[in-house]
């Protein structure tokens, strides 16, 4: 449990019942780096006088919504700049970072974060180059299958780890490498003359769900890697007793993004969510504390903005389908927030990845 007393942070470990067996208490798993992120953002909430949703709504209703947006966006930009500066300083100390690894769960904003980090790295005189793990899938017939017999593309072993590490090592030695392109129609890698050679100013940016898994890059020296974990960690509570689950933040983002860009209804996104969460529990969360730094992509004001976009999508879920209960719960939840329009949100905001209107290309 986290709470603020005066200007100090109080931290208490509380064991909670197991989901499958309420008679058994869960073991306490220490997550010191994530705790530091919560402490930092709770401290800022306290400074701004926002301890719960009621405080936030009052600030919006008294004409301070734009101020909240500006401060929240500035805090994120400052944090991204600090991460870029830390990467650069490591090179000055003789441990030049050659590979930045970015991981995080679904709809955490990894893609926009990587683009904004690349901008900040360029201000330090570095040349970021993105590497896509999607191009390193094994041939389709070699892809592992899940318990239902379907191709499991979220598995680490759906990737050609040997080729990936061989090419990374060659790049870090200064050799020229022809990068593969995965043809999803044929289910095979192709080579189209996409060659790459990096110099001392180039830094590779790798974003993906397996980026923090040590099995992904076992042959790359630890000193050459900088690991970042990105997630939307909600740090405002409904009241003094009810915390907002961080997964609700990401689910609302995904519902809006899937509707805007992938043609999926809220019903379809909600139905897929349990399998997405299962993949996160298996492939992402166990490795989050491996990160050198954690970045909180949640914005203090975002539920108020998400409400305006999510309400019409959620209300379209039929009452007679299994997903209606979850849609109704989310609708009831977002109505606790005073709605805020997105016109004041800058085009580089992480939220633009889901709402649209971003100045970045995806």
What are the functions of these language-model segments?
Residues 1-6, 11:
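Single conserved hydrophobic/aromatic residue that forms the stacking wall/gate
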Residues 110:
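Conserved lysine of the Walker
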Residues 100-102:
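Hydrophobic anchor at the beta1->P-loop junction of P-loop NTPases
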Residues 94, 164-223, 273-287:
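Glycine-rich phosphate-binding loop used to anchor ATP phosphates in small-molecule kinases
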Residues 113, 117:
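Hydrophobic positions on the alpha1 helix immediately C-terminal to the Walker A/P-loop
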Residues 35-81:
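Charged, amphipathic alpha-helical linker segments immediately N-terminal to NTP-binding catalytic cores
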Residues 129, 138, 142-185:
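Conserved nucleotide-sensing/catalytic segment adjacent to the nucleotide-binding pocket
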Residues 91, 218-362:
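Conserved NTP phosphate-binding and transfer environment spanning the P-loop NTPase/kinase superfamily
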């Amino acid at each position: 449990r986290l709470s603020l007393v005066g200007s100090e942070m109080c931290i208490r470990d509380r064991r909670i019942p197991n989901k499958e067996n309420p008679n058994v208490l869960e073991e306490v798993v220490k997550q010191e780096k994530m705790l530091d992120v919560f402490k930092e953002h709770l401290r800022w909430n306290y400074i701004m006088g926002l301890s719960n949703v009621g405080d936030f709504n009052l600030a919006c209703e008294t004409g301070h919504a734009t101020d909240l947006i500006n401060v929240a966006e500035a805090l994120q930009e400052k944090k991204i700049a600090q991460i870029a500066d830390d990467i650069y300083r490591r090179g000055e100390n003789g441990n030049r970072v050659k590979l930045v690894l970015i991981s995080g769960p679904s709809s955490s904003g990894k893609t926009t974060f990587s683009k904004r980090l690349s901008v900040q790295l360029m201000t330090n005189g570095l040349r970021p180059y993105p590497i896509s793990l999607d191009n390193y899938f094994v041939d389709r017939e070699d892809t592992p299958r899940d318990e239902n017999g379907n191709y499991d593309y979220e598995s680490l072993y759906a990737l050609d780890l040997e080729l990936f590490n061989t090419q990374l090592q060659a790049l870090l030695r200064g050799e020229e490498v022809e990068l593969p392109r995965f043809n999803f129609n044929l289910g095979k890698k192709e080579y189209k003359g996409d060659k790459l050679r990096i110099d001392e100013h180039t830094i590779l940016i790798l974003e993906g769900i397996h980026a923090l898994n040590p099995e992904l890059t076992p042959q790359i020296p630890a000193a050459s890697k900088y690991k970042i974990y990105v997630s939307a960690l909600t740090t405002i509570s409904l009241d003094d007793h009810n915390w907002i689950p961080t997964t609700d933040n990401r689910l609302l983002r995904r519902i809006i993004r899937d509707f805007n860009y992938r043609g999926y209804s809220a019903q379809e996104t909600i139905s897929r969510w349990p399998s997405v969460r299962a993949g996160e529990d298996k492939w992402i969360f166990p490795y989050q504390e491996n990160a050198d730094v954690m970045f909180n992509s949640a914005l203090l004001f975002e539920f108020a903005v998400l409400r305006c976009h999510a309400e019409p999508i959620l209300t379209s879920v039929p009452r007679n389908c299994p997903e209606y209960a979850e849609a109704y719960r989310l609708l009831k939840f977002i109505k606790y927030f005073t709605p805020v329009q997105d016109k004041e949100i800058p085009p580089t905001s992480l939220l633009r990845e889901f709402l649209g209107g971003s100045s970045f290309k995806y």
